[in-house]
Design a protein with these regions (language model features):
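Basic, Lys/Arg-enriched alpha-helical interface segments
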Residues: 1-90, 98-104, 112-117
Length: 117
């Protein structure tokens, strides 16, 4: 019975402070109509890892930090100058726009599908 008060005292010292429980609100997310069409087309094709695409999207929504180097995330140039692109796997890409509080998923597909005229 003597261990119970000791255990209670130990648990009280492990209590989190109010500051350690606070977090920044995740970014608001939106999808372009073209992205939704891309999602349906890619999902039905069975050639692309849609779970990995969803993983990248969730990381972009939840984190303020840049994606890890494995995603090959970079800004685009030319007519896509205000967009970013990350590589989901091989030639499978995600194009998006982002700022501190908002992210918009614009397109997804291969280089030739997204950038050929």
């Amino acid at each position: 019975m003597r261990a119970l008060p000791l255990l209670t005292n130990c648990l009280l010292t492990l209590k989190k402070t109010a500051a350690s429980k606070r977090a920044v609100l995740p970014r608001a997310a939106d999808y372009a109509k073209a992205f939704l069409k891309d999602w349906q087309r890619l999902s039905h094709s069975g050639r692309f890892d849609m779970v990995r695409l969803k993983e990248a999207m969730l990381l972009l929504i939840a984190n303020d930090a840049p994606l890890a180097p494995e995603w090959l995330d970079h800004s685009l140039k030319g007519e896509w100058a205000d967009h970013r692109e990350c590589h989901i796997g091989g030639d499978f890409l995600l194009i998006y726009q982002v700022d501190a509080n908002w992210i918009n998923f614009v397109r997804s597909g291969t280089h030739s599908e997204l950038f050929s005229n």
